[in-house]
């Protein structure tokens, strides 16, 4: 198995990946479905239902967290399932998740202009035609296509640009949500809660009502899986990536629960019934009642529109990276692995998915509802396969470094498989309430046939290269397993070492390097004194992040300065020596007049 240096730029911060995951999960549902949730389970019953659903997804999220930190490569599910199940399992898993992403992107393109009609009823102008009972208007079509083009353009311009857009919109969503919650506390009344805390007139019917909410909630948490798709672009310690993924799920559960409580506190059962019979936007009407102003309902709808765009943006990021990873493994045409020369984004994959989102509104909203339901089925199938991969890899690769290592993996893995398998079953079993209708099965079947065609054609075209996988090298320190000593522990051990230090003589060697390299052992704080015999200007060589974040680099640099030795930094070392450009470092040393090298870390 080969290794290569990542072609992506590491531009995503911890905040970026948090808002990408959270924004993907918080779409339009909290605006349009809250009344239905309360009607099914009652206010507190719906909150408990979301908590149960969150726990179901939480176990799946734990498997993702461990695998993403262990294999931080573009494609996420593609890499996990490849290592566990081989190329065929990887193809099925990744192709399924791509269906989920593409369908969501296309659906959001239609959802946005539809919501504008709630704010401006006269928005629809220029009737064109009708598809499956849905009327297509020129104004509706124009807005959908223009926004689809804009979001695709933003993503092509760079991952960081897309993350910035995500941050702005997520802050707006959070702000609107906080306004509703605070206003409901001020303007609401506990008497509104009393008659609608729970649905059902007995313990058994109440529990059944709560579970009716719980079984539908996992579908509102789809989106946290976007994080592993862009793992190569994340500039965050690997262990923290897993933590952020879990945090995003917790925040989504909390957001939904607080919105339900806010609506229930300010709206009586009769208010909710009237709202559902009218606009159907119970949350927006709750906002208007809390502020005693109809304008505030439109403010909340704007927040819902931001939720549509954050989901859209996140799934476009995820879908394009998943396609890139399949093309990288010769499973689909190689053209989809092309990166933009300047922005380092998978440009051809973005062109395709973005193009589909621009064309999607032509087919109307009803047809895209069928597609997105089929896509959700694909996401749940991928979740189940990733959960299985988690268990398989604990047996198959126990020695794999796992920066974020889940405890009690057997329990977590089995529960994750059961939970995700349950979600898949809900789409398959007739009468479950979420089962696919014939049109949706046709969509899923068509996607499966397209996948089979790609599989056969690429297998014949690329032959033995089909399904090949290339690992991406990462920094040594970043992949340290949980059981290993931490970098800080190692540094402490060095600082408390014996005072007697053996300095080994310099070793000269020929590697086309115009400098001498000295290897020596000693305490960090004595680096300057140890370096004195070998030169007057040092090149400090280290990896990308760990030495600087731990403070080791600062200690070495200060020691050199105290000893009167100038120094410059070369921090482009990767884990795999074959991917580290030695000549680049040598040229840098020569250009800066360095006559000694101080290397920090094993990779250096």
Q: What are the language-model segments listed below?
A:
Residues 1-12, 390-411, 431-500:
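Terminal cytosolic tails of multi-pass membrane transporters
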Residues 3-8, 47, 123-139, 168-298:
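Helix-loop-helix junctions that connect adjacent transmembrane segments
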Residues 9, 33-134, 248-251, 443-449:
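Extracellular loop-to-transmembrane helix junctions
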Residues 36-42, 46, 110-111, 124-136, ...:
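Transmembrane helix-loop boundary segments of multi-pass membrane transporters
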Residues 64, 73, 96-114, 221, ...:
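Membrane-helix boundary/coupling elements in multi-pass transport proteins
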Residues 79-81, 86, 118-123, 129, ...:
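TM-loop-TM module centered on a large, flexible mid-protein loop between adjacent transmembrane helices
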Residues 139-190, 245-250, 372-385, 411-415, ...:
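Membrane-interface loop-to-helix entry segments
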Residues 551-604:
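N-terminal small/polar loop signature for handling phosphorylated ligands or for N-terminal nucleophile
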